[in-house]
Amino acid sequence: MANIKQISEIVNTGGNDVILASLPIFHSFGLTAATFFPLSEGIASAHVADPTDAFAVGKMVAKYHATIMFGTSTFFRLYTKNKKLNPLMFSTIRYAIAGAEKLNAAVKREFKMKFGVEIYEGYGTTETSPVVSVNTANVLEPEFFKELVFSKEGSVGLPTAGTIIRICDPTSLAKLENGQAGLILIGGHQVMKGYYEDEERTKEAIVELDGVRYYNSGDIGFLDEAGFLTITDMLSRFAKIGGEMISLGAVEAQISAVLGDEVTFVCTNVADEKKGEQVVMLFSG
């Protein structure tokens, strides 16, 4: 319920809003944002059983004048590539929010070009209900006519209301300064009580610091001076080569700069007799 209220404040829903509910409910993003959220807030929702059926999604948005859609980078890519989708089908959408995976820059750009709709990237985990932070539209301050910035390129936005983000050293859990990348701890009412009948795993995931109960996300990132959160990697996605820690995410970023977005790939680490580990790339296409 806490996360539902946080989502409501983010999108600032009104009586005329209609939620496109196409995400699977076995995923926390689909269950909380696309299912429980409209039910709890008394907002109309239009349901599509298969989010990969791009034309069915487009027809549902157009028929019921959906104004808010939650999706993933993978699904948004399908909509940009589908030739059956007329750009006017998404003309009523005022908020398209991406989560569950990193928003591909090309997908964000192509979706805006085709439909005229900006995709706002967010971040979350199942253990935090899941929404932790999100970019939203900038607004004009009515008294002094200054732009209030709520979105930053490359970031996953500002923490939701009542959410505490602590960036700390992965080993000592000492708090780090703004701009320094470290382990992301998440505090707030939306944090889970624990894993079902698994006290040992719960103790590993939940830590209390300075009177705040945090979830250890296992992700690496930093906060800037304005409070925007940027994800840089996952703690588990490092290879130790010859004693040096190599970020798999950084390797992937360099490969993406060369190959572009047409090749789907992922880097992983495997054992190596000489250097301990080595990085290998798995790809398709």
Where are these regions (language model features)?
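Conserved ATP/PPi-binding loop(s) of AMP-dependent carboxylate-activating enzymes
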Residues: 155-162, 172-206, 244-246
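Conserved ANL (AMP-binding/adenylate-forming) active-site segment centered on the GW(Y/F)…HTG consensus within
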Residues: 116, 148-153, 174, 191-218, ...
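Beta-strand->loop->alpha-helix junctions that form or flank phosphate-binding loops
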Residues: 120-127, 157-159, 268-271
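Conserved AMP-binding/adenylation subdomain of ANL enzymes
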Residues: 2-18, 26-68, 82
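AMP-binding/adenylate-forming catalytic core of the ANL superfamily
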Residues: 69, 188, 193-194, 204, ...
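Short hydrophobic/charged patches on amphipathic alpha-helices used for structural packing
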Residues: 54-58, 85-87, 203, 252
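Active-site glycine-centered loops adjacent to acidic/histidine catalytic or metal-binding residues
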Residues: 100, 124, 157, 219, ...
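Gly/Ser/Thr-rich phosphate-binding loop
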Residues: 66-71, 80-151, 164, 173
